[in-house]
Amino acid sequence: MKRACLPGLALLTIGLTLAAPVEAAPSCQPGENNRSASTGLVFSGGGAKGAYEAGVALGLKERGVSVTAVAGSSAGALNAALVASGQEELLVKLWREVSNDQVYRLPWSMGLAGLLPGWITLWYLDQVGALFDLSPLRALTAEYVDLARIREAPTRLFVVALDLTSGERRVFTNRNITHDLLVASASVPGVFAPVAVDGQLLVDGGLMDRAPLLDLLELVGPVDRALTVVGYGDPTPLAPPLTLRRILERTLELALPYQIVKDAELARHRRPDVAIHLLFPSEPLFLRPLEFEGERIARAIELGRKDAHACLDRLGG
């Protein structure tokens, strides 16, 4: 397939979880004015931490930054879809109004299993495909994401999912994205059930591609200029009680940043002409991946917006 070329692409990669400090290029250092450069966004997900991404997207739009291409996996896929359609305000509205029961629910049978003797519970867990039901997210995605608008949008969209059957990554674009594919990209195996699409069992693309930076660089072709941002902090300590849910959330938080940073290093090696940075929250979010409501969501949105403005101030764009 012939790759399209987007000259003057500025690449902004948004990371959501806080990693331990690593060696990386300086964040948002003053340099050439990138105001006229087009911008590519890469969203990494992180469950409820996607609220931070929404704030960043809104902050960029408020400053007149033109997004030419956007890629996402996991929760970042939904964010990427609404940015591709030019609906950053709607994206923020979604995050401000979302609640846990609009994203997932515990199947009634799972609750019943907790009342059964241990050996029966183990048998039950061998019969089910996931801890939580993502049906509410399907309804939410259908309500907010206008597929026709995405297909007509000038902003190029890339969404990553993983096919459990073949073990291969799948990249979907404006032309073939669907609501089911967006849900599939957020379906962490074991936590949420795989989504069957055209004979494939699709799950969270972030398992193999936390932030699809390399996909974006490959699919958009040569890049002349780049607007990039990086920031990092320390992970929030795991507090008791050590429930299964908290352990799963903590595992996801620790697994996310390492691959994102390694991919950025690889991208810098492959594309020395592009300055690539990772924008992480400037302050701890104190937001758990499955915590889709409350003041912390609102705070994450505002922090993302503030960080986007601060980054552009330093870049002169």
Question: Which residues does each PLM region occupy?
Answer:
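Bacterial N-terminal signal peptides
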Residues: P7-L18
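Sec/Tat signal peptide C-region and signal peptidase I cleavage site
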Residues: A20-E23
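Helix-rich "cap/lid" substructures immediately adjacent to catalytic or cofactor-binding pockets
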Residues: A25-V70
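Non-catalytic peripheral regions of patatin-like phospholipases
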Residues: R35-T39, E88-L140, L164-T165, R169, ...
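Conserved small-residue
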Residues: G46, V56, G76, T141, ...
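Short helix immediately C-terminal to the catalytic nucleophile in hydrolase catalytic domains
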Residues: E53, N79-A80, L213
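Short glycine-enriched nucleophile-adjacent loop
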Residues: A77-E88
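A short alpha-helix-loop-beta-strand transition element characteristic
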Residues: D101-L106, V145-R156
